[in-house]
Each structure stands twice: as C-alpha cells, then as structure tokens.
Amino acid sequence: MIQKSRPALLQHQDVGDRVETLMLQPVIKAFLCGSISGTCSTVLFQPLDLLKTRLQTLQPSAHGSRRVGMLALLLTVVRTESLLGLWKGMSPSIVRCVPGVGIYFGTLYSLKQYFLRGHPPTALESVILGAGSRSVAGVCMSPITVIKTRYESGRYGYQSIYAALRSICHSEGFRGLFSGLTATLLRDAPFSGIYLMFYSQTKNVVLHSTDQLDAVLVPVVNFSCGIFAGILASLVTQPADVIKTHMQLSPVKFRWIGQSVTLIFKDYGLRGFFQGSVPRALRRTLVAAMAWTVYEEMMAKMGLKS
C-alpha cells in the first residue's frame, strides 16, 4: 500500500510544482520588462544624475557667495573630464538599475496580484504598493547605490566595482555598504508611493474622460502622466535626497539623519536641502516616465496587465 501511494504523492507534488512555475512566470516577465525599461532610461539620463550629485556636494567655502548653476557645472565637467565624463558612474548605475528596477516592478506586480486581485488600486493603495515595492528594491540594491554615488562625486578613485566593495568593507566595515539607507528609503519609498498614486489616478482620469483612445496615443498619455507625477514626487522628496547623498559621501561626518539635517542647514542654509533639485527633478521625472511607458508597452505585448 505504501509503494502504491508514493507515485500518487510524487504526481501531486509535480502538479504543484508546475502550478507554482506558471504562477512565477508573469513575475519573471515583469522583472525582465522592468529591467529593460530601467536600462534604457538610465543610459539616456545618467548625465543629469551626475550633475545632481555634484551640485549637492559643492563646498560653499570654495565658491564663496557665488552660486554655481547646472549649466556652468555641465561646462566644467565637459572641459575638465571630456564629454564622456558626464557618464561617469555608468557601470554601477547599470548594475543598480537593471536588477533594481526589475525587483521594483516584479515586487509591485506580485503585490498587485496578491492584494488587489484584478481591481484598480485606490489612491492610498497606490501609495502603499509603490512605497513597499521600492523599499524591497532599495534594501537589496543599497551597496551598489553607495558605490554609484561615490563614483559620481569625483572624490573617490575606485578602479572597479569590486575594488570599491573591497575598499568600503576594509575601511568602514560591512555597515559602510548601507550608508544612508534610512535616508534612501525616506526618499525613494515616498517618491515611488506618491508617484504611483499621481500616475495611476491621473491616467484613470484621462482614460475615463475619453470615449475611445487611439492605441498609438496610449504611450503618449502614459508618458505625459508620468511627467506630471514625477515633478510632484521629486519636489516632495528632494530634502531626503540631499541628506542621503551627504551620508553616503561622508559617513564619518554625517552619521545619522538628525545630525545631517543640522550640519547641512549650518553649512548651506535652508537652500541646501534643495541643491541639485533641477537636474534631479528632470532626471527622476524623465526616467520614471520612460520606465513606466516602456514597461507598460512591453507588458501589453506579453499579454499581461501591468
């Protein structure tokens, strides 16, 4: 009797494994779509991220009362580091964004399927889903984010990603790979939550206000809604981004958030919390809008609802 029941048990396990595999396939597709969309947007808009980092870390003592604008800094980088200098830090950016955006979209898709079960999210649900998905991706990719920020700042002479990892672990310990993680989550989780809320709500209003939208115009509508949502979300989370940058570049000086807020205000004043806001708003808005547009188009081609 025992021998007869074993094949049935194995057969039941095989069916369970197959069902589990089928359930995972859409998540893998969402991960791949997110990774591809993140790669495209990262390569295009990397110069804006570099300029944002440089603007946030300019020393006031070196420039006196004279403000350095984005255009002046752009010309300085091109003159001293060549045009390719604008793409400095591209390697860690790609290493971070390819899996990072994929993890975000994969997690978001899974949460939507589990909690929403097909119905569109409310404004509050969008905030929670976006913030939760971004938190998962942020924790997973924190070490690469630290390396990327230091690459872009121009203060560190890392020869490779591996050399950077080894140097940070040697000088700061394993904890150094998670410098500024709290500030990163305080910046990214609200950004993603606010962005997803504005994006989904704006898109619903636009789509419901038109009887029949031409399929060719759908990507344009998605991109436009993404631009609007990105601008609002970027402005709200700008101070947290400045704090995160300082904590990752100077972890000895900026040890915790409260201390960082005090030091930034002392050195730069209230304006210091909004340094680099223009390139960041441009980049985050364009990156998010393009990533969502490409992601939704690819998911539609695969027959999946994003």
Swiss-Prot record:
It catalyses: glycine(in) = glycine(out). One of its GO terms (biological process) is erythrocyte differentiation. GO terms for molecular function: glycine transmembrane transporter activity. The chain crosses the membrane at residues 31-56, 89-115, 127-152, 180-203, 221-247, 276-294. The keyword Oxidoreductase does not apply. One of its GO terms (cellular component) is mitochondrial inner membrane. Solcar repeats lie at residues 25-114, 121-205, 217-301. It comes from the Eukaryota. Belongs to the mitochondrial carrier (TC 2.A.29) family. SLC25A38 subfamily. This is Mitochondrial glycine transporter. It comes from Ovis aries (Sheep).
